[in-house]
């Protein structure tokens, strides 16, 4: 599938913010009518974010998880998301909106 937009969000202990992040991205991208993916890069979270990301990915093919075994930092998470992104355009956003 050709992807127009890749939205990359580094995640570190953002369990409470993930549902709203997903909802808003899905709402905006669906309204735009473009093909898209949401690359969620879990940077060693310890609050359940990892499991939440994996569950979202099971339910929605737009969600692409990238899971780190430990915390490498914000910039490394962004770089990994960029590397995994398949879109013609890549948008970086923070999970806390």
Where are the language model's segments positioned?
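Structured catalytic core of nucleotide-sugar glycosyltransferases
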Residues: 1-97
């Amino acid at each position: 599938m050709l992807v127009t937009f890749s939205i990359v969000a580094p995640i570190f202990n953002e369990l409470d913010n993930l549902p709203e992040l997903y909802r808003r991205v899905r709402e905006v991208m669906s309204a735009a009518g473009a093909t898209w993916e949401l690359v969620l890069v879990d940077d060693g979270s310890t609050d359940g974010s990892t499991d939440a990301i994996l569950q979202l990915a099971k339910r929605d093919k737009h969600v692409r998880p990238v899971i780190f075994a430990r915390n490498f930092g914000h910039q490394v998470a962004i770089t990994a998301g960029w590397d995994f992104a398949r879109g013609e355009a890549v948008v970086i956003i923070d999970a806390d909106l």
